Amino acid sequence: MNFDFSEDEKMVRDEAARFLRDNCGREALRSVLEGEAPYAKNVWQGLCKMGLPGTAIPEEYGGAGAGHLTLCLVAEQLGKHLAPVPFSSSVYLGTEALMAFGTEAQKQAWLPKLAAGESIATLADIETAQVLTPDSISVSVQSGKLNGKKLIVPDGAIADIAIVLARSGPESLGLFLVNLKDPSVNIENVAAIDPTRNTATVVFDQTPTESLGAGDGWLQLQHIYNRAAVLMAFEQLGGAAAALDMAIAYAKERFAFGRPIGSFQ
């Protein structure tokens, strides 16, 4: 059985690797860490021009329809080059939620914009510093209006829409689609442990919202987590590969006692 990647998958991987190698070096990362910009806009625009945010989005919604394995290969390259862009929040979380649970009207309205990078999505779930459980959710929806506060929202200050986990009844949770540009939404940047990742506190005050399809919001959230975990694992794989490459290069270049230190192993 052949477990190798297809030619199309290899092509997308190699194009992503080439672009990131040429445009996402240490300078791009340092400009975000030391500057005012929340992410590397030129890198993000380049990724969008290549259609990479729409890798797994079906063609009928403006995406490439290339599937999640191809998206995993893109994620690996993003991790390898530490790309400071809102890819994980918009693609792994927001877009995945819309594709899995959104209504047809919601998909038609937002997936083409997300595929082109014209809009950025995120997921708002956490409310406390403790482990997230169904009982810890107090943000609620009544009569189509959302109220409450969400913490550590990835790229919350730059996203256009959010998929919000909220209480729809005393014993029920749901996922809701919210326009973060609505004036009833208050957003405050919060410093993250990883400065390459932007997070925000988001407060909703009678914010208009609509249900993201139907179903148990908690079970839907686990589905989103599972998909995102695989994609984040590929980012980590890319980061580990980059660290190994740096270690090997150092072992070849660093001399001790007249020999490269790698020769002592």
Regions found by a protein language model. Name each.
Residues 117-128:
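A short, Trp-centered hydrophobic/proline-enriched beta-strand micro-motif
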Residues 124, 149-186:
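A short core secondary-structure module
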Residues 27-49:
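Short secondary-structure junction/hinge motifs that connect adjacent elements
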Residues 48-108, 112, 116, 154-161:
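Internal helix-loop-helix
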Residues 9, 20, 74, 103, ...:
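Residue-level signal for inorganic ion chemistry
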Residues 94, 117-119, 133-137, 158-160, ...:
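A generic structural signal for well-ordered coil/turn residues at beta-strand boundaries
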Residues 2-12, 52, 80, 185-265:
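Glycine-rich beta->alpha junctions and the first turn(s) of the following alpha-helix
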